[in-house]
Amino acid sequence: MIKIRLTFSNDKKGLIEFAEALDNIKRTFNVLSVSKVYKGRGESKFSNVYIDVENK
């Protein structure tokens, strides 16, 4: 199992980039789980999502 952390900006462009990255990951790996979105601390403009994958 491999754990991937995706960090992306909290704006429309960042959400689009996140969705595209997740689609690419799904094409390459078997996705076991995707966490909820974790907002950055304080005034951070970024969020994180954790993805558990395994090789196809």
Residue locations for each model-derived region?
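N-terminal acidic leader/helix
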Residues: 1-25, 33
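Short, intrinsically disordered low-complexity segments
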Residues: 34-56
